[in-house]
Amino acid sequence: MSKPTREEAKEAVRTLLKFIGEDPSREGLLKTPDRVINSYAEIFSGYGKDVAEILNTKFYETCNFRDFILLNIKFTSFCEHHILPFNGTVDIAYVPDNCIVGISKLARIVNIFARRLQIQEKMTVQIAESVQENLKPLGVAVKISAVHSCMSMRGVMQDNSVMNTMHYTGIFAEQQKYRHEFLNLTAKR
């Protein structure tokens, strides 16, 4: 698949404006195609970014703690089904084996995956598996809680529904006590 030119993308926006009954040549919409293309470039900037590159700065120190947890990483993504936003928080825990990363690195990988067309279930797995693959900890737990505009703006019109997804690797997948502790910590916010 070849990438369309900027002008082709702008023409697609004009076509969508016509489809909804708008006149793309009216004053308020003249610059809308450019604005949409610029917004999409930022919103979907997660494509082509390498998580391994983000997580390659590791600290190989003796870990004097049993596990690591970062709560409440805020994100906004767009569902691949309706291209409508969903937003919420990500909680990440891992039990280091011999290395850790700076906490901003975890927020950065959330942003990489959130800035793509997504489904929440897949994003949860992608975050957990990327931490597992790159840091090789004893285990990883990821929980995402999000509100989906495709549920609140259309269809069933449920604006208070929160979807929770979890994915576990290593000792979090194998031992219930680790999962239980993680879920207790994430519920106490």
UniProtKB/Swiss-Prot annotation:
It comes from the Bacteria. Keywords: GTP-binding, Hydrolase, Metal-binding, Nucleotide-binding, One-carbon metabolism, Zinc. Zn(2+) binds at residues 79, 82, 150. GO terms for molecular function: GTP binding; GTP cyclohydrolase I activity; zinc ion binding. GO terms for cellular component: cytoplasm. Its EC number is 3.5.4.16. Pathway: Cofactor biosynthesis; 7,8-dihydroneopterin triphosphate biosynthesis; 7,8-dihydroneopterin triphosphate from GTP: step 1/1. Pfam families: GTP_cyclohydroI. The keyword Signal does not apply. It catalyses: GTP + H2O = 7,8-dihydroneopterin 3'-triphosphate + formate + H(+). It is an enzyme of class 3 (hydrolase). GO terms for biological process: one-carbon metabolic process; tetrahydrobiopterin biosynthetic process; tetrahydrofolate biosynthetic process. InterPro entries: GTP-CH-I_C/QueF, GTP-CH-I_N, GTP_CycHdrlase_I, GTP_CycHdrlase_I_CS, GTP_CycHdrlase_I_dom. SUPFAM superfamilies: Tetrahydrobiopterin biosynthesis enzymes-like (SSF55620). Belongs to the GTP cyclohydrolase I family. NCBIfam families: folE, PRK09347.1-2, PRK09347.1-3. Toroid-shaped homodecamer, composed of two pentamers of five dimers. HAMAP family: FolE. This is GTP cyclohydrolase 1. It comes from Rickettsia rickettsii (strain Sheila Smith).
